UniProtKB/Swiss-Prot annotation:
Residues 1-84 are annotated as: Disordered. Signal peptide: none annotated. Residues 1-198 form the MAGE domain. It comes from Homo sapiens (Human). InterPro entries: MAGE (IPR037445), MAGE_WH2 (IPR041899), MHD_dom (IPR002190). The keyword Phosphoprotein applies. This is Melanoma-associated antigen H1. Residues 44-57 have a biased composition (Acidic residues). Pfam families: MAGE.
């Protein structure tokens, strides 16, 4: 057999073995944390898009959540988009959903309590994400999807998360609640239930939740 053909076969065999190993790791992770499989399966491909480059500026990082929301809405038509797919998107959608259902902010301790059900702990390496705290508190914040800041007058200091300006631009309340409905349909006992509606879309959102996303198509 020609040497070039042998070399290609060896490379193909190595690539196939690597793919098999990656699938085994992901299957193991999902079997240990059933909610993880539910969250990933519940995330539609068009729920969120985002840039691979760093979109944030020092001004964005220092804005209040209210300023971020109004600024994002004003910039909505001109914000560039590119694919932000896969497991990171599922993780981000989980956090955005939690922030929303907790009344537009979520304390860091609660975020990690919920993510713990996905097999993610701060300071502990995850087989898929690596360092989850770095992704959540650095990458998602740097890209403008989350705002991460101290809780006023907390002692010892606590931190909380808000939707960042890019999350307001690239997602929506209905998309996030559609995601929550699908997750709840699989593992409702793992999600908090103290919803705090604050918009004119209450009836439509409640319909999504009550239906468990069966037969409902988000706009």
């Amino acid at each position: 057999m020609p040497r070039g053909r042998k070399s290609r076969r060896r490379r193909n065999a190595r690539a196939a073995e690597e793919n098999r190993n990656n699938r085994k790791i992901q299957a193991s992770e999902a079997s240990e944390t059933p909610m993880a499989a539910s969250v990933v399966a519940s995330t539609p491909e068009d729920d969120l898009s985002g840039p691979e480059e760093d979109p944030s500026t020092p001004e964005e990082a220092s804005t209040t959540p209210e300023e971020a929301s109004s600024t994002a809405q004003a910039q909505k038509p001109s914000v560039p988009r590119s694919n932000f797919q896969g497991t990171k998107k599922s993780l981000l959608m989980s956090i955005l959903a939690l922030i929303f259902i907790m009344g537009n902010s979520a304390k860091e301790a609660l975020v990690w309590k919920v993510l713990g059900k996905l097999g993610m702990q701060p300071g502990r390496q995850h087989s898929i994400f690596g360092d989850p705290k770095k992704i959540v508190t650095e990458e998602f914040v740097r890209r403008g999807y989350l705002i991460y800041k101290p809780v006023p007058r907390s002692s010892p200091v606590e931190y909380e998360f808000f939707w960042g300006p890019r999350a307001h631009v690239e997602s929506s309340k209905l998309k996030v609640m559609h995601f929550v409905a699908r997750v709840r349909n699989r593992c409702s006992k793992d999600w908090p239930c103290n919803y705090d509606w604050d918009s004119d879309d209450d009836a439509e959102v409640e319909a999504i939740l009550n239906s468990g996303a069966r037969g409902y198509s988000a706009p």
